[in-house]
Amino acid sequence: TSCPTNVGTGLRVSVMVHLPALVMTNQVQQVLGALAPLGLAVRGLYGEGSRAFGNIYQISNQITLGKSEEDTLTNLEAVTKQIIDCEMQAREALKTQSPLITQDKVWRARGTLENARLLTAEETFSILSDDRLGMEMEVLPKVSAGFVSLLINSLQGCLQYRNEKPLDGNLLNYERANFLRQMYQRKDG
């Protein structure tokens, strides 16, 4: 395309990161806000102009002129590791400073996933994020289905394909909740 940020190598590299603890501790803006001066852009789950549903952020390089492909990859990898370190520190802070609030949040998410009858896509992404945080912090028991698989398979297109008919409104939200209830009945130890 004719976008000025594509001048140079034209290499666009991005990574998706799940940052629920940074969001819960109100540190996400501070951490991600420091990326623009480094030539990195932060977007939501669906790219430019989108929100970060499910606490998932896309981080990508903006500058391709005057940087080698190797430098671009090395820079993004180093920054990603720092962001992950910040997320892990925030999780530790939640464990030590707000254990009951954290436990309540993740257990409420699990209860909703196991029992809800209607779930919007936005609510699903939010509670799946909380549930994953609970599993990774070893507060909640693991489930057999993976986080990304659950996110993708709870989207409208996948639900319509599985049900072999168009879905919208409450019927779509019902089928999404039904799918997730079934997935959460399959627990792994």
Question: Residue locations for each model-derived region?
Answer:
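Conserved phosphate/anionic-ligand binding catalytic regions in large, soluble enzymes, centered on
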Residues: 1-17
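Long, Pro/Ser/Thr-rich low-complexity/intrinsically disordered regulatory tracts in eukaryotic proteins
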Residues: 11, 23-25, 30-189
